[in-house]
């Protein structure tokens, strides 16, 4: 939003592209999404094993997302802009430290360091640095408390429903049998619908026992829960955070416009990425 406004262009196309890619580009690495971490924890796969299975579906999802966004937003991406002078960091030392921490996150994840440890160390380093140099920037308001409470409530609701037959019902909806293309698509679409109804994290946890009959079904479920939550504004944690940032940035998000774009794009994304998964079995 800041970059778009500095350039004097309409922020909506870039905001929509950000939330789409935050979801669809998260398939490639096991640390890119909490649902990916849940799958890796379930299967015990290494980073190499996961990437070996998901590289093609992830690249297909990324390419199709960019193509769809270009088509859906073509009228908004017309015109010229002047390139402004780059902004000067308020604190160069903090800026360089933050860049270094971000650059080290990827290699640390790939080398197999537990994600929780990487995240905690990175957060601690930056928190200490800000406490020393810009203490006023550290506020409890930076923590998205409403998001935390909402997500916990969704987990509790799904847990209660599981005790009252949710898993059996989801098994009927998602289907069973050999891993045909049809069953993988059914699993992916079930995950997408569930994600848009409740949120992709509780949706994945609820459907994981149903899809655990094979690694391919778990990956199809991951495709559904990562690519699917682009229709409702609560479909994923990324979407919830994005909406909160849009609100704080004075950008009004039209749920209708968001939902229409998602309703057009999600089925195409699910079919193409699931087909790529099926072809690389």
Region roles according to the model:
Residues 36-51, 80-82, 164-177, 204, ...:
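Membrane-interface helix termini and inter-helical loops of multi-pass transporters
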Residues 9, 48-92, 97, 231-281:
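Juxtamembrane and boundary regions of transmembrane helices in multi-pass small-molecule transporters
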Residues 27, 53-65, 114-124, 156, ...:
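Structural signature of hydrophobic alpha-helical transmembrane segments
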Residues 29-36, 117, 196-207, 232-241:
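Transmembrane helix boundary and interhelical junction motifs in multipass membrane proteins
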